[in-house]
Amino acid sequence: MSGPRPVRAPRGSALTALGWQQEAALRMLQNNLDPEVAEHPDKLVVYGGTGKAARDWRSFDAMVRTLQTLKQDETMLVQSGRPVGVMQTHEWAPRVLIANSNLVGDWANWEEFRRLEALGLTMYGQMTAGSWIYIGTQGILQGTYETFAAVAAKKFGGTLAGTITLTAGLGGMGGAQPLAVTMNDGVAICIDVDPRAIERRIEHRYLDVKADSPEHALQLAVEARDARRPLSIGLLGNAAELLPRMLAESAPIDIVTDQTSAHDPLAYLPLGVDFDDMAGLAAEKPADFTRRARESMARHVEAMVGFMDAGAEVFDYGNSIRGEARLAGYDRAFDFPGFVPAYIRPLFCEGKGPFRWAALSGEASDIHKTDKAMLELFPENESLHRWIRMAGERVHFQGLPARICWLGYGERDKAGERFNDMVASGELAAPLAIGRDHLDCGSVASPYRETEAMLDGSDAIADWPLLNAMVNVASGASWVSLHHGGGVGMGRSIHAGQVSVADGTKLAGEKIRRVLTNDPGMGVIRHVDAGYDIAENVAADQGVRVPMTEGN
């Protein structure tokens, strides 16, 4: 069958390909488009505005067909969501190499990208959409949870109880915000223009209730705040209208951030445009739509700055809304920081980042067993134990059961090897796909997000994600990806990802040990090179070799 159709990854231990590395890539590609997982599966859009798993349905079918027949010493090459070749390599090489959305510098902008996309020559891969390791909203949940925990520690005595957070965006990424806030015992008002997004987050248990109006939302929020009761509230509307209104009315807001699809102006609803007319207007008049969207973002960001001036804790959550507002002429757009320099960079210095794994069996029990193994492996990691317990109780699986937790250098390899042993012993029903977000300690160059305000000024140096991709290829990852524009939009980021399959074999164990040591090791090295003392101490303690620090 050609064209849109429901897609669901196979379950169980029976192979539909010639080996588990190929089978894992096949299942994770299909899982990205599972209706439980993808935001708009009929359009091949997984998350992040227009982040796709395949360029078109013909390309999707060709990738499925190729993966089913790919040999153990062959590698499929994917160019922006289309399979363009199969090469004979060797068993240590990745089974798939992926390059998505990459453009030469002077051409790296949305206008040129859209021209090429209209010609059928490229696609937007976001981060984990085109690299086939998206696991639904859980994929960003712990990072969002840890960010709000850091806000609580910095400003509110270690808890968000008794506070109200105001934010917008309830898509695949932003949908993690309400649960992340309530996991920290706070109250959240979450705005979105799409009623379906609000309903989907309630259905998946990330969002508690929907308010009838801004006044109703504030009433619910204040009641819950005063009772120190966690609550997340969905509010239908345009943040560019509602935030200025709430600011003018002196709404009692303690924290403000945003996760709308501001990275792509065509995915941000301008003031004065009905949501139902959005797609048509964006397609018919993209330049005018972009101008109006940026003007609306400027109003949105101006209100965020206003809340900051009034005493709220305000931060950019990495969607480039400050950059877009500045393009619209708002001079104070960068008065508040991004979340990485404000809260996350010390973790990056330790090689910590979003480690994730998916049960290819489709059995939730496999994830529960790996949860138990994680608690046994790291008995003294209190934050990990708290997270695993909360995730087990509150996280709804989308598609293949999966788990995410932030692990650092010297931890990821231990977890991966333990998982491989569990597959080998038969404790798990089938192999695991072990990967991560491209948002990681050593795999991104993104001056508006992961590498904002680097100590040595190296925000825009893009050698690091390229080195990261090459290191993962050399170390034996099952598939490796190199993308452009994820998270913050065209011209603003280069980033790499890897997935390694734990199939229980000795070879898989050797690969996993190398990949899951070297991949986070790149984060330590990158931050040592930038002059961070924490990273230098980790490198010294853990034996990470950095030639420029040797022989001094």
From Swiss-Prot:
NAD(+) binds at residues 48-49, 126, 172-174, 192, 238-239, 259-263, 268-269, 317, 487. Its cofactor is NAD(+). Pathway: Amino-acid degradation; L-histidine degradation into L-glutamate; N-formimidoyl-L-glutamate from L-histidine: step 2/3. Catalyzes the conversion of urocanate to 4-imidazolone-5-propionate. It catalyses: 4-imidazolone-5-propanoate = trans-urocanate + H2O. Belongs to the urocanase family. Gene3D superfamilies: Urocanase like domains, Urocanase superfamily. GO terms for cellular component: cytoplasm. One of its GO terms (biological process) is L-histidine catabolic process to glutamate and formamide. One of its GO terms (molecular function) is urocanate hydratase activity. It is an enzyme of class 4 (lyase). The gene is hutU. Keywords: Cytoplasm, Histidine metabolism, Lyase, NAD. It holds the Pfam family Urocanase_N. Its main location: cytoplasm. This is Urocanate hydratase. The active site is at residue 405.
